[in-house]
């Protein structure tokens, strides 16, 4: 007789494992199916390992500028294999902790590939194939790097890399090409440039970081090029050839050769061969599974979360969707709210944004005021030697409600949370500038930007005469 569960989650990434934990804590008998490692792409092949390498690169950058702080270092070397080993240790430690959390919540884990065979049955293809019954199912199958047309990622072409393979390089490339100037492409460009690689980024459009915010795109393009990263915008790659000891690219008809090529042109959704048709779940031509605000698909007892919903390809969005789905299965009436989703780019410097951009506000006909306050007027940033950059607040012109924000500069990834909370709770500018911010801190930049919006800045001249 097949084992029965209240909730079965297919995929143990940041959406799936959070959904499983939430369901189990709500008293549901829960199963979690994963064919690889707990934590999914984020923990094992994405967010965490790349940030571990970026942490090492940040120390390299600090050493190079140590003389500005009165510290003179006579020569240093980069042990890249040791950096990679540290990255692996970080991932393994977090994964071990995650497996412990799953066990402590009494979640039954099945190792294998989950596939629907009906709306209430899941087949597990693993060492010992089995079928389990499910009252409710959450699909959290994620996505994979998209390959360059006609050039699949394989061990036969170790110099043509995806975002997974690039994390396991044995050496720092002398000369590296990155196809795609989006978030992932720019993060790796920043990483390897800092480590000493000669980096070229090839982007088909006329701007990098297409976030519907031209200010971010232009500012970061200027910073990257000033630091020495080469960009080819409006460029088309027609062929990639693995020559054994190098890779040959044809770019706009011109041939260039590199040690390694990173292909970063988006991700392919994992919605094929998971039995959607057998359960009656609708999926569009892109592989997206439509859901309502409770994360329910067209089949009432089947939910979908994460990349496959076609919303935001962000781990924290997947996690929140997982919470919403699990709580609805448990009988609550939760709905997802995408009004305040923070997005972070882990480059040097960091970039973060949330809510409406000036462009999206204009497109929606919303009258807004955009105020940008520079870090060079923030004492802590100057003391840290990181005064380049700014924080911008987008507020409604009349009501002063905060509708969006973006920040380029030190610790942007952490700073964005204050404005995320403000947007989520429909706060206004006075809620920020009337709040006492600790001094000296980087967070003061938000109070100053809010004051600037009402033309009463404390640490820069007002605009009125």
Swiss-Prot record:
Cofactor note: Binds 1 FAD per subunit.
The reaction(s) this protein catalyses: N(6)-[(R)-dihydrolipoyl]-L-lysyl-[protein] + NAD(+) = N(6)-[(R)-lipoyl]-L-lysyl-[protein] + NADH + H(+)
Cofactors named for this entry: FAD
UniProt-recorded name of the protein: Dihydrolipoyl dehydrogenase
Alphabetized Gene3D superfamilies for the sequence: 3.30.390.30, FAD/NAD(P)-binding domain (3.50.50.60)
Family: Belongs to the class-I pyridine nucleotide-disulfide oxidoreductase family.
Disulfide bonds, paired cysteine numbers: 42-47
Annotated EC: 1.8.1.4
Note: The active site is a redox-active disulfide bond.
GO cellular component: cytoplasm
GO molecular function, one term: dihydrolipoyl dehydrogenase (NADH) activity
Signal peptide residue numbers: none
Keywords linked to the UniProt accession: Cytoplasm, Disulfide bond, FAD, Flavoprotein, NAD, Oxidoreductase, Redox-active center
Residues given in the record as FAD binding sites: 34-42, 51, 114, 307, 315
Purpose of the protein: The branched-chain alpha-keto dehydrogenase complex catalyzes the overall conversion of alpha-keto acids to acyl-CoA and CO(2). It contains multiple copies of 3 enzymatic components: branched-chain alpha-keto acid decarboxylase (E1), lipoamide acyltransferase (E2) and lipoamide dehydrogenase (E3).
Residues at which NAD(+) binds: 180-184, 203, 237, 264-267
EC top class, as a word: oxidoreductase
Cellular compartments annotated: Cytoplasm
Primary gene name: lpdA
Active site per the UniProt annotation: 439
GO biological process: 2-oxoglutarate metabolic process
